[in-house]
Design a protein with these regions (language model features):
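C-terminal peripheral helix-coil segments that are non-catalytic and often amphipathic
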Residues: 1-5, 93, 97, 139, ...
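Short, Lys/Arg-enriched anionic-surface-contact patches
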Residues: 8-14
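Hydrophobic/aromatic residues within well-ordered alpha-helical segments
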Residues: 14, 57, 64, 68, ...
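Helix-turn-helix
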Residues: 17, 21, 25-59, 63-67
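Amphipathic alpha-helical linker/stalk segments
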Residues: 65-94, 102, 144
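Helical hydrophobic small-molecule/effector-binding pocket
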Residues: 66, 88-124, 171, 205-209
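Amphipathic alpha-helical packing segments from all-alpha helical-bundle domains
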Residues: 104-109, 113, 123-150, 160-164
């Protein structure tokens, strides 16, 4: 089971260290603290290396966002048959990771900064968050949904609609409330489990039915 991971960024360990420093600078000092000079000092690397790896400052921001999004995992079990239990585990893992990332200081800082920039240039940071963050997560999750449908474990007409139903069940209004200063959940695992239960009640296929569908499809 390996839903499409082509959109997942592949950073070297050293690049990951640099991105962690960039995230720390953003959380501790805000937008103005995140400069290529400041990041080079904090990460003990040259500005030339930063430009080589990430390009300009927008490239650093895009890499930071993609790095954060990569922490929301789906499946990575090459060659393993997708079963109802494995699908459930992968959905729960996705839900837990999503909640943990959204509730983190980095995500909240990035989103608040993007909101604060909405009146300037259409919020360049907001566009980066959508393209390198949310869409990356969406594509990987929808690949898992499609894998579940091919295995006759999920039933839906539109993967995008099914995924956004699941996303809404996981996140609800929690992200907005956290952006407004409320604390995150004490138990992300339980929230993810409840969301998966509700999603499978809507789109899951009972085991007997799934077996019959696989037989009829010759799988």
């Amino acid at each position: 089971v390996r839903p499409d991971t082509a959109d997942t960024p592949q950073f070297s360990p050293r690049q990951n260290e640099v991105l962690e420093q960039a995230l720390r600078l953003l959380v501790e000092g805000g937008d103005k603290a995140l400069t290529t000079s400041g990041l080079a000092r904090a990460a003990s690397c040259s500005k030339e290396s930063l430009y080589k790896w990430f390009g300009d400052r927008d490239g650093v921001l895009a890499a930071m966002i993609a790095y954060q999004a990569s922490k929301v995992r789906t499946a990575d079990r090459a060659g393993e048959k997708l079963t109802d239990q494995i699908l459930k585990q992968n959905l729960e893992q996705f839900g837990r990771d999503l909640l943990e990332v959204l509730a983190g200081d980095v995500s909240l800082a990035l989103n608040r900064l993007a909101i604060g920039q909405t009146s300037r240039d259409g919020s360049k940071l907001g566009k980066l968050l959508v393209e390198h963050g949310r869409r990356q997560i969406d594509r990987r999750a929808m690949a898992l949904m499609e894998a579940g449908k091919r295995a006759s474990l999920l039933r839906f007409e539109n993967a995008d609609a099914a995924y956004h139903t699941f996303y809404g069940l996981v996140v609800s209004d929690l992200h907005i409330r956290m952006l407004l200063g409320e604390p995150g959940l004490k138990d992300n695992s339980r929230q993810a489990e409840r969301a998966v239960e509700a999603f499978l009640a809507l789109h899951g296929v009972e085991q007997k039915t799934a077996d019959a569908l696989r037989v009829s499809a010759g799988r």
